Amino acid sequence: MDLTITTLEGKDAGKVKLNEEIFGLDPRDDILQRVVRWQLARRQQGSHKAQGRGDVSRTGSKMYKQKGTGRARHHSARAPQFRGGGQAHGPVVRNHDHDLPKKVRALGLRHALSAKAKASDLIIIDDLASADAKTKQLVSQFAKLGLENALLIGGAEIDANFQRAASNIPNIDVLPVQGINVYDILRRGKLVLSKAAVEALEERFK
């Protein structure tokens, strides 16, 4: 698969041949769903907690005698049906993380890259670098490239000026190549890779 390399100014900078094993797969939604679910589960804090009937600060003694009142039979006022009682089956502190094999994670990343390539939402940029940390200039360059909602992946190190300028633009994310992940790829409309990022990805999956 051949793609044209462009500069931030929108000029042609040659062509690059992409590895079909990384960018040319037929995307599988089930694999992408598994990886996204795994990522989001790892992010979930899991510190939610509601007081059950054993946690409520209230007497545990019987409310009133069993017989002779004409009222319903009850024991403790900690029961869930009473105001101030404990919650029934409420959330508890737990870890939402679950296992996903490394091979499935790697396959998910390749399928996400292939999905963007298949949808023509993959752009290769010569270099993600800026002489000045000027957001206005970068917005103008992105407009020429049609980037309104995009994830930009640079090399191992992101140019400081480019990072600073891009951080002020809504719906634009910038990550080094080691931070690339399925969820961020899929949540943005366009995927922009630098030449260095393409080389690093092909080396990673070699």
UniProtKB/Swiss-Prot annotation:
Q: Where is this region: Disordered?
A: 42-94
Record-level GO cellular component terms: ribonucleoprotein complex; ribosome
Q: Is RNA-binding one of the keywords?
A: yes
* Basic residues bias (residue ranges): 64-77
Q: Which GO terms describe its molecular function?
A: rRNA binding; structural constituent of ribosome
One Pfam family in the UniProt entry: Ribosomal_L4
Gene3D superfamilies assigned to the protein according to its UniProt record, in alphabetical order: 3.40.1370.10
Report the record's Gene Ontology biological process terms: translation
Question: What keywords appear on the UniProt entry?
Answer: Ribonucleoprotein, Ribosomal protein, RNA-binding, rRNA-binding
InterPro entries, per the entry: Ribosomal_uL4 (IPR002136), Ribosomal_uL4-like (IPR013005), Ribosomal_uL4_dom_sf (IPR023574)
Q: How does it assemble?
A: Part of the 50S ribosomal subunit.
Summarize the protein's role: One of the primary rRNA binding proteins, this protein initially binds near the 5'-end of the 23S rRNA. It is important during the early stages of 50S assembly. It makes multiple contacts with different domains of the 23S rRNA in the assembled 50S subunit and ribosome. Forms part of the polypeptide exit tunnel.
PANTHER family for this protein:
50S RIBOSOMAL PROTEIN L4, LARGE RIBOSOMAL SUBUNIT PROTEIN UL4M
Hey, which family's this protein in?
A: Belongs to the universal ribosomal protein uL4 family.
What name does this protein carry? Large ribosomal subunit protein uL4
Q: Which organism is it from?
A: Brucella canis (strain ATCC 23365 / NCTC 10854 / RM-666)
